[in-house]
Amino acid sequence: MLTLDKIYHAKFVLKQVARKTDLIAATRLCPGTDLYLKTENLQVTGSFKVRGAYYKISQLSAEERAKGVIACSAGNHAQGVALAATRMGIKSVVCMPDGAPIMKVESTKRLGAEVELVKGTYDDAHDRAVELQEQTGMTFIHPYDDELVIAGQGTIGLEILDQLPDVDAVIVPIGGGGLISGVAFAIKSLRPEVKIYGVQAAGAPSMEHAFHDHKYETLDSAVTFADGIVVKTPGETTFDMVSQYVDEIVTVSEDEIAAAILALMENQKLVAEGAGATPVAAALFGKLPLAGKKTVCLISGGNIDVNILSRVITRGLVMSGRKTNLMIALEDKPGQLSLVSDIVSACGANVVSVHHDRSDANMAITSCFLKLGLETRDAAQIETIKQKLTEAGFKLVTERA
């Protein structure tokens, strides 16, 4: 049974490996909201996961340590297990889905773990890890549905109360539920009036469904670029704790997560992975009642794969009205492009790409489609450009991001 004493013990044990991450005021992120960021993206291994993994492994018996540990993970828990096991001189094996970010796979190997890539999702990697555990007798280090792991994650709750004693609300990402279970238990045990909100990706809302349906259930599929929270089945222990200690769970879209990542980079100079940005997405897009509340967004990790970061930034620019593509029907005669360019320039936008299309079957023989890629200030400027083009007699055929 999880107790507050166990979380305090985890805090003592973790002093030798995990850092007390900064809690910073997000003064430029969400005007009108008293927002703070708990920067677990700056934690050892770039994620909160080292807390639970290290505390769990530290409590193993000598016999268990001799046999080694095994885990399954999309990346962050893998790195936490690898680091903890290596520091204690214990063999570690980690099963990871084959779609896990290359950066996380390679980092796990560098930290000393033996990695086995498993075709499919996290759940498939979990099944393989359980199979290997039964064959080898190694201790399975569950990423979230384990009391000691939850206790380790709960140390973040103690730190938040220490760093911001008058906090009113905390927003926490949810995958399997280990992080929010520990944080909620710690905070509610000491300050029961503090609101604890959870956030999931709309494409992987396993705990959100279970929470609102009041029953433990499994999704048919879970798809999101926020790989750290792609879980089809929440934990049984965590579901019970979330049902008891969490006040509300909401979901955010892929575009909203991308916009939050961009906002954190531009306004706070912080790099967050998809999962870590979900609390900020919930705040930015008004998913929760935060007015008048001192609110902490828990940035759970910063291990985003650079191969997808550029796409995420592009999506974030589109969501924030900083980038758009327009398609305009033109008469195919000299001077038309110049007229369009003058209008765009007068509105203060920047043309970054131009393409003429004379082959579309839907256009008149004497016409062409002009496709423009624009850099803009915001959504209002985009609307002004459209209005000016329409007033000048140009027809906007379609618009694509």
PLM regions and their residue ranges:
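PLP-dependent amino-acid enzyme catalytic core
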Residues: M1-A401
